[in-house]
Amino acid sequence: MADSASESDTDAAGGGPAAMQSSCSATSGGSGGGGGGKSGGIVISPFRLEELTNRLASLQQENKVLKIELETYKLKCKALQEENRDLRKASVTIQARAEQEEEFISNTLFKKIQALQKEKETLAVNYEKEEEFLTNELSRKLMQLQHEKAELEQHLEQEQEFQVNKLMKKIKKLENDTISKQLTLEQLRREKIDLENTLEQEQEALVNRLWKRMDKLEAEKRILQEKLDQPVSAPPSPRDISMEIDSPENMMRHIRFLKNEVERLKKQLRAAQLQHSEKMAQYLEEERHMREENLRLQRKLQREMERREALCRQLSESESSLEMDDERYFNEMSAQGLRPRTVSSPIPYTPSPSSSRPISPGLSYASHTVGFTPPTSLTRAGMSYYNSPGLHVQHMGASHGITRPSPRRSSSPDKFKRPTPPPSPNTQSPVQPPPPPPPPPMQPAVPSAAPTQPAPTQPQHPVHPSSQP
């Protein structure tokens, strides 16, 4: 834009003298022409001459303005060139500074990378050492856990076997209880069906009675009409009434009679409905009582079962404690039962150290009870059943004459009672159905009295037969 302005200024400046020369030539030509006009006949008017002078003045003014603009544009161009030079210098300095900063940053990062590599190598070495240590430690713990797992699995199998046997007994008992409850439920259903049939029969009998009364009333009405000498075309009935009556009085009398009859029948119907509603309410009340009784008996049965389970649990705990006491007593007897054998000779017997004769029967227990230990706390419930001291006593034989109380005592029948079957809920019905079959016999496990731990009986001391002299 500045270049085009400068070109226009130069053109205008270059064209200024030419225009002036052309104008001068024109004026001279005009003057000459004036002289020649006089000679040649060409005349320039003064109006045209004034117009040309005005145009020349305007062109000169425009030329001055364009020259001023050219000067301003030249100044602007110089300022822009200086500014461009300054910007180039600033860019060179900024680039040099950026290169210095980049080199400094690269050096610092290289140092940090070297430090991190060294730290990484040290960490790798430490990690390998720690990993090796942890691997050895974990392998040792794994072997220990495997041994413990094998032992626990063995104990668990024994406990599971004991629990399975116990649960099988409980399942059999529950199956027997379920069968008895199903039989009771079937009996209640049959009783309900019988009650419904009885109710239907009573309703049918009531309807038949009402129909008989209606027939009887129709017959009485027919007799009364015959007595009054009224023409009876057909026996009037509530279902078939003849509306053809001779006089209005007979009609009114007949209407009053029918109204009275309807009122009486309505009263009978209301009484029958009231009686029926009372019976239904009574039956519903009986059914509600039976349901409540059934629910109460079920809750009582549940409480008895829970109580029986609790007592069985306490009994098993007491049996385990008795077994431990018996084992402890047996160990003490076997360890402290060294006394001389009683002989029949009056001469006192002095055993020699080289004699291989056993001193007393208690001494022979040592070979059997060396490896005997009371059960641990982990398998106290299950192992005591299998490692009971009764097994050692049976192994010793009956020649020693030791009598020990059995750890699993059979309860006497006077301490336990069999649960009686629930009474029939249909106690208010007139017809008593046959009682439900008793539940299958169960093992007595629930004492009737409060759960009391039976006192352990003291085992009898071994009796050694002594011959009289």
From Swiss-Prot:
Location in the cell: Cytoplasm; Cytoplasm, Cytoskeleton
What do the Gene Ontology cellular component annotations say?
cytoskeleton; cytosol
Please state what the annotation says regarding this protein's domains. Answer: The protein has mostly an alpha helical conformation similar to myosin heavy-chain tail that might adopt a coiled-coil conformation.
Q: Does the keyword Acetylation apply?
A: yes
A Pfam family it matches? DUF2046
Q: Where is the composition biased (Acidic residues)?
A: 1-10
List of residues that carry N-acetylalanine? A2
- Annotated spans, Disordered: 1-37, 335-362, 394-469
Task: State the coiled-coil residue ranges.
Answer: 47-320
Pro residues: which segments have biased composition? 419-444
What is this protein identified as? Coiled-coil domain-containing protein 6
